[in-house]
């Protein structure tokens, strides 16, 4: 709703922030530390603002900082959202592309209360610019998100959706991700 508050990381992905603003939402920004969103600042924002609708976070390789939220902070984020009755929008376009270190469980994997909306993208793992994404959320939320998306661009290109469907139907996704990680690992090693 117009005037509702979305809590986001500072800095954050400008594309998402502009989308939220286009619906008349107010943004309350929380600093990003080395291990993710500042949880003390987040709780302060949640205490002081009663019309927060959701918390937007990019916990893996946060855009633009590149930082990854620690497991402890992910647990705290989930508990704060539960305590204050707000949703979490976990945007994870880069999570499958970790080339070193241990994977950190998603916030969605902790969700026993149906408060985490999980978003992923095929643009980072299949083809840049394909612009096909997905969400995992309760049906009423998916229905509202569908209406919002239709207002932005009518729908994702049908041809691109068909390409993704065919690719997912005929490809070993995990093997493909392994190859992509190897390519990125080699490029990272060359640059470092």
Regions found by a protein language model. Name each.
Residues 1-14:
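Conserved PLP-anchoring active-site segment centered on the Schiff-base-forming lysine
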Residues 15-22:
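Hydrophobic alpha-helical segments in the ANL/AMP-binding
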Residues 23, 83-84, 114:
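Helix C-cap/helix->beta junction micro-motif
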Residues 37-99:
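Active-site phosphate-binding strand-loop segment of PLP-dependent enzymes
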């Amino acid at each position: 709703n117009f005037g509702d508050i979305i809590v986001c990381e500072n800095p954050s992905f400008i594309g998402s922030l502009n989308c939220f603003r286009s619906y008349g939402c107010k943004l309350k920004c929380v600093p990003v530390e080395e291990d993710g969103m500042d949880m003390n600042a987040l709780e302060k924002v949640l205490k002081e603002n009663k019309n927060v609708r959701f918390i937007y976070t990019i916990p893996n390789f946060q855009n633009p900082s590149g930082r990854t939220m620690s497991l402890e902070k992910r647990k705290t984020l989930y508990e704060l959202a539960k305590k204050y009755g707000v949703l979490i929008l976990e945007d994870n376009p880069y999570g499958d592309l970790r080339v070193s270190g241990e994977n950190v469980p998603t916030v969605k994997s902790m969700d026993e209360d149906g408060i985490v909306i999980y978003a992923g993208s095929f643009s980072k793992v299949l083809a840049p610019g394909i612009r096909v994404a997905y969400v995992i959320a309760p049906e009423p939320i998916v229905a509202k998100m569908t209406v919002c998306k239709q207002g932005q661009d009518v729908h994702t290109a049908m041809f691109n959706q068909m390409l993704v469907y065919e690719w997912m139907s005929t490809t070993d996704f995990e093997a493909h991700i392994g190859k992509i990680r190897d390519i990125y690992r080699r490029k990272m090693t060359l640059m470092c």
